[in-house]
């Protein structure tokens, strides 16, 4: 059974985002193990934000697929690349990087509205990001997207997730 069909591809092209429930459900437990390993042994790229009010921290780290075996296994043995190529109308896809974000319930840190593309420092229109929730989340805590915003050619200067300019 395919999780992404032609209607999904059409909606992704038009809206820039789609919801695919359960698409990687067979991988969630393995990815959770990888996240636990990462939190226990973060990379030099780790950037956690500790709220001044004492609420839960916001952990983030990126580019760990080559040292966390669970991430490597997911990237090379799941349908991630296949689904990416479908959504991009491409015969192939290339993996750019992983980015783990862990915001515990009750954290006062708000993720700022942003576009992913300015963070990547690459050109091109064929790009897809997968946001994979490893825990149940409320509607208030989930990712929100602005349908069609990818078509505007307007890029906003990226900020760190505590609101400072990234560069």
Regions found by a protein language model. Name each.
Residues 17-19, 129-133, 145:
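Conserved hydrophobic/aromatic beta-strand scaffold that supports enzyme active sites
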Residues 1-113, 119-121, 158:
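Non-heme Fe(II)-dependent double-stranded beta-helix
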Residues 99, 115, 132-136, 147:
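Short, structured patches in soluble enzyme cores that scaffold and shape functional sites
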């Amino acid at each position: 059974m395919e999780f992404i069909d032609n209607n999904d591809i059409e909606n992704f092209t038009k809206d820039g985002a789609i919801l695919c429930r359960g698409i990687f459900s067979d991988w969630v437990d393995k990815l959770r193990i990888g996240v636990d390993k990462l939190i226990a042994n973060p990379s030099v790229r780790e950037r956690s934000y500790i709220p001044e009010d004492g609420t839960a921290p916001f952990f983030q780290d990126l580019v760990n697929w080559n040292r966390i075996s669970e991430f490597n296994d997911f990237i090379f043995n799941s349908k991630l690349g296949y689904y990416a190529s479908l959504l991009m109308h491409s015969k192939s896809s290339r993996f750019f990087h992983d980015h783990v974000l862990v915001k515990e319930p009750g954290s006062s840190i708000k993720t700022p509205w942003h576009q992913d593309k300015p963070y990547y420092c690459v050109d091109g229109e064929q790009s897809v990001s997968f946001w994979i929730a490893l825990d149940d989340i409320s509607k208030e805590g989930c990712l929100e997207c602005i349908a069609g915003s990818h078509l505007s050619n307007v890029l906003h200067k990226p900020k760190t997730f505590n609101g400072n300019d990234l560069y």
